[in-house]
């Protein structure tokens, strides 16, 4: 589940170098970014800082290039992670948990670094807009399949109720089967569950699992799985 961004001095420097490579000159950057509007003209690349609450946020081109840079940095990080595995002798396919319509990264670029696309799906079933929820979840399946034009995996789905949605409802009988088959119907090759055994503690100790704190195999959820 890659995400987040860093605004430290090292990342600021890397961002400026990325901009230099893209635009070559500060004059060209000013022209492409239309910085003359509202007197945002830069005199050098060293004056540019990432958009943040304590900096500039009104230049659309700055915001867009920053997001592109964050994707570039993340993809480069994934590339080096995989390289380390390959150097260690692993030939297994690689993947990463993608997340819904996550706006922090360009998943089409991230998908180029991994062998198999997989994503975490946690739809909020059993609300008034259940049909819209099904449409939305199906659209995400289609998006994930389109990232590489190949079948994908549903990496995470909750077999019962989550611990973090505003109202975390237990799935009705048959709902887990329907949700899993929706992934297969949209081009998926597998539907996996998080988690197999409920955590003993920490943030997700009340997150649903195939085997709950009771520990038995005679629960409805276990039988549904």
Regions found by a protein language model. Give the residues of each.
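Polysaccharide-binding and catalytic clefts of secreted carbohydrate-active enzymes
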Residues: 1-139
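Carbohydrate-binding surfaces of carbohydrate-active enzymes
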Residues: 41-51, 91, 111-115, 122-225
């Amino acid at each position: 589940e890659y995400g987040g961004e860093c605004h430290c001095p090292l990342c600021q420097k890397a961002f400026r170098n990325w901009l230099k490579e893209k635009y070559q000159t500060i004059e060209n950057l000013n022209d492409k970014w239309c910085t003359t509007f509202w007197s945002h003209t830069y005199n050098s690349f060293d004056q540019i800082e990432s958009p943040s609450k304590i900096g500039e946020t009104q230049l659309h081109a700055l915001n867009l290039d920053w997001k592109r840079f964050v994707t570039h940095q993340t993809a480069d990080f994934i590339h080096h992670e995989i390289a380390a595995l390959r150097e260690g002798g692993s030939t297994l396919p690689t993947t990463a948990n993608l997340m819904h319509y996550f706006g922090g990264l360009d998943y089409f670029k991230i998908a180029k670094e991994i062998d198999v696309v997989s994503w975490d799906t946690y739809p909020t079933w059993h609300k008034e807009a259940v049909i819209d929820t099904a449409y939305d979840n199906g659209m995400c399946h289609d998006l994930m399949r389109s990232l590489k034009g190949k079948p994908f995996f549903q990496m995470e789905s909750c077999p019962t109720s989550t611990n973090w949605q505003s109202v975390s409802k237990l799935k009705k009988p048959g709902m887990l089967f329907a949700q899993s088959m929706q992934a297969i119907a949209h081009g998926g090759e597998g539907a996996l569950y998080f988690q197999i055994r409920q955590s003993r503690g920490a943030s997700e100790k009340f997150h649903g699992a195939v085997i709950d704190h009771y520990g038995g195999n005679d629960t409805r959820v276990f039988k549904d799985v």
